[in-house]
Amino acid sequence: MDSGIGLLAAAAAVRRLRPDADLVLSSDPDGMPWGPRTPEDLTGRALAVARAAAEHRPDALIVACNTATVHALDAVRAELEPDIPVIGTVPAIKPAAASGGRVAIWATPATTGSPYQRGLIRDFATGARVTEVPCPGPVSYTAQRCG
């Protein structure tokens, strides 16, 4: 699930790993992008999309959106698990910071600076110089051109 076309990359990865899997793609095209939304609004929209997906009785639900993961993952898990395992996606801070040096994290404004992302930086980027870059434009632009 995602607000828009971002879920296609996750679906392609699952398809490569499990070509036999039946995939249900659940999105919120009327509400995209989720990045500029408040955490409360985003959580409500993510729960609605997750409920729609859950009606299809999937083996698992992938929250293919960093913004939804950092703000709504706990709520989605509380509602669907243990019947449906819920898998979140977050910025790949740990592998990016593994060699030290400089790391730039480009994400929606709702993800950048969130307590969740700050925790990832604290826990996994101790030897790196991390710059958070809030970028609302690319998501909106891509959604308008490709969605």
Where do the PLM segments sit?
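Non-catalytic structural scaffold of enzyme domains
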Residues: 1-147
